[in-house]
Amino acid sequence: MEKKAKPGFWDKKILGTAVKGAFIKLNPVYMVKNPVMFVVEIGAIISLALCFFPNLFGGNNQDMILYNSLVFIILLLTLLFANFSESVAEGRGKAQAASLKQTQQDMQARLILNGKEKVVNANTLKKGDIVLVNMGEVIPSDGEIIEGVASVDESAITGESAPVLKESGGDFASVTGGTTVASDYLKIQITSNPGESFIDKMIQLVEGASRKKTPNEIALSTLLVSLTIIFLIVIVSLYPMAIYTGIKLPVSTLVALTVCLIPTTIGGLLSAIGIAGMDRVTRFNVIALSGKAVEACGDVDTMILDKTGTITYGNRMASEFIALDKGNKNYLIHYAILASIQDNTPEGKSIVTLGKDLLKEDLDTNDIRENQFIEFTAQTRMSGVDLADGTRIRKGAYDAIIKYIKNIGGEIPHDLEDKVNNISKLGGTPLVVCAEEKIYGVIYLKDTIKPGLVERFERLRSIGIKTIMCTGDNPLTAATIAHEAGVDSFIAECKPEDKIKVIKDAQSKSKVVAMTGDGTNDAPALAQADVGIAMNSGTTAAKEAANMVDLDSDPTKILDVVEIGKQLLITRGALTTFSIANDIAKYFAIIPAMFLAIIPQMQVLNIMHLSSSYSAILSALIFNAIIIPCLIPLAMKGVKYKLQRSEKMLAHNMLVYGVGGMIVPFIGIKLIDLVIAPLLTMMGLG
């Protein structure tokens, strides 16, 4: 599967906008939303005040102006780097939003009023309006096709150049504003008011206008705020103790100590990680309608998968007509064609095509308008036709036809079950055909399992994710395909309400459930699931019920989205571990330097042997600032995710980001000290 091309990290336009955004976000009204970085900003303001009023907190500190200035500059850079990381993440989304907005500019629509056309601005259309869109024209807003069949170019939204066939009725009647009618014409009923269309929602989300913190972000922010408060209490307590013991502790040093000990690294990158997670989902042409949905993907442990389209290609085609009595084969084909002549599904069309190829004589279908066609429903699980002469023809699932025949007083042929079972054992789908009380035979529908799924399901199983296949097929067919595909379990003869029951049962056991769907009958289950991915080719009801929409309408993407969600959680956890581990090294850099002159016993903790107290504090501050931009690519790209047991993954990340988070600052601070110590000596701060 190809990812959609997005603006690169080093795109000049994005970087320019990000630099500007970094300064704009210094506004305290914005900074207060990130308590950790807000504390840093307060520290920077205090340091700036001390540059002009060095004796603000008492004492004679005229010789500290240069030191205070250096602390202020480093703290300002820390804030700018943190804001820059968030602005870069937002910039990628805004670049995508700009391209989406181009599809809405100066768009006109042919509004049908009282049977007449009227050209109006697309942004004036409201729910319920009916518009006509001819070949080459852009569909003005989201809607449902009420008349016409046409190819629709969705490349402006999905990036896929191949047109998609759209027609009224069924699950492929939904169209998206901004796409283009490539052939024929469509009459569309608008389903959204101005500002509420799918493109409008996409623009709001990728620009970050409607992004809310996810539950895990809130929990992590609470932890970071708690750690910040604890360190603030420690620092505030340290000041009177220093005065009591006769130790001179400049306020700028206390500010520096505070900034170094609070988790500024993860505090500065937290928003960028969340925004980048949503961006990674959009790179797979999936629109997440909330950050919570992406995050929930990382916790998924149960996946409800439709057989058709997800596990198999979904193009079940008629392969053979199997008559119960060989002398009645032509009757079987004849009745199968009549029952399918108005069935616009691929299966129905394939039955008509194969049947006409096999029949030696032409079939008269001119009087079909006088017939009453019976549409397939998930409840009856059969379809058919009542002919003008009163003949009732039905085709459908084995058990549904059996029930139907018994209800009208017919008999069940003794060899029917064997023929149905033989097809099911081959992984095919049997459709039984009857006319009046007599069953004439079975249609063999074949489907193919998508390559690579067996290995993928095995990988999911290895990390504890259970896969459940839902299908309307009979148990034998379902069991054969489930075994071949390698899913953990299956639900045969599945109705829409069965999916909801499975989801609720799993959720009652504290499981996090994901599923895909495209039809109106999938909407309740999509709404119930923790992660519901609707196909863009599906109905409006399905897209409104889901919390994600797949623009490519590829149900197998649920597997990729789950992996992205897990990568998001792992990235956030890894960088949090790294940030907190950093504090240990910074502690050993600053604390001994502050008290060594007065408390010689601190020499035991002075394992870094930094040049001076000023050099130690400034080196730690500089490292604290530059580590943020160094980690921006990792926050944006995400920690490399491997499908493995959580215990093994935790051990690996603790080693890399925990132990590594302690070692890197020791090396970094020492190297910075070696560079700046001579400069500080020249400035009189040696």
UniProtKB/Swiss-Prot annotation:
Recorded GO CC terms: plasma membrane
Source superkingdom: Bacteria
Keywords (A to Z) from UniProt: ATP-binding, Cell membrane, Ion transport, Magnesium, Membrane, Metal-binding, Nucleotide-binding, Phosphoprotein, Plasmid, Potassium, Potassium transport, Translocase, Transmembrane, Transmembrane helix, Transport
Molecular function via GO: ATP binding; ATP hydrolysis activity; magnesium ion binding; P-type potassium transmembrane transporter activity
Intrachain disulfide bonds: none
Catalysed reaction equations from the record: K(+)(out) + ATP + H2O = K(+)(in) + ADP + phosphate + H(+)
Top EC class for this record: translocase
Principal location: membrane
Membrane topology, as annotated: Multi-pass membrane protein
Record SUPFAM superfamilies: Calcium ATPase, transduction domain A (SSF81653), Calcium ATPase, transmembrane domain M (SSF81665), HAD-like (SSF56784)
Residues spanning the membrane: 37-57, 64-84, 223-243, 255-275, 588-608, 616-636, 656-676
Cellular compartments annotated: Cell membrane
Chain's role: Part of the high-affinity ATP-driven potassium transport (or Kdp) system, which catalyzes the hydrolysis of ATP coupled with the electrogenic transport of potassium into the cytoplasm. This subunit is responsible for energy coupling to the transport system and for the release of the potassium ions to the cytoplasm.
UniProt record similarity statement: Belongs to the cation transport ATPase (P-type) (TC 3.A.3) family. Type IA subfamily.
Protein name (database record): Potassium-transporting ATPase ATP-binding subunit 2
Species of provenance: Listeria innocua serovar 6a (strain ATCC BAA-680 / CLIP 11262)
